[in-house]
Amino acid sequence: KDGKKLIREISELSPVPVFFRAHSLLVTGDGEAALKWGSTNAYTEDENGNPIYDWTIIDTIFDTYIDLGMKPLAQIGFMPEALSTHPEPYRHHWKPGAKYEDIYTGWAYPPKDYDKWAELVYQWVKHSVDRYGKEEVESWYWELWNEPNIGYWRGTTEEYIKLYDYTADAVKR
């Protein structure tokens, strides 16, 4: 409630569109926020490894931004548990005073299947265009990952470049 009020006030102060970003938009979980953790459960797989997409939480976030006159800065990340090369442990339980490195768990790793990753990104962009319109979605910024130069990315530089290539192709498809 108060967060929406603050976002609205920020939006109203600016003569140009304000872009707003949420982390962890593709992270697996129950959608409940916790210290240094967020999740949307946008991607899971059935028992046969087939993708299941659920945009409910992301839609709620982006609907809020748009309803308040803002634009999403769509952060493409982090890795869903079903796609992570190192899914266990997945959710961290970091608390102040603990080593910060403990925050980097399964969500920070490359995908085990780059084609499934690209399809996830494509389906998200396609869903966004279907929901908000092409003109609106083309006005957004799309960011891959966040600070891959630190522990937020546990793969190699080459794996990040590969992730970038697959992601950029999927967004533009």
Label each PLM-derived region with a short phrase.
Residues K1-V18, H23:
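Mature N-terminal, pre-catalytic/accessory segment of carbohydrate-active enzymes
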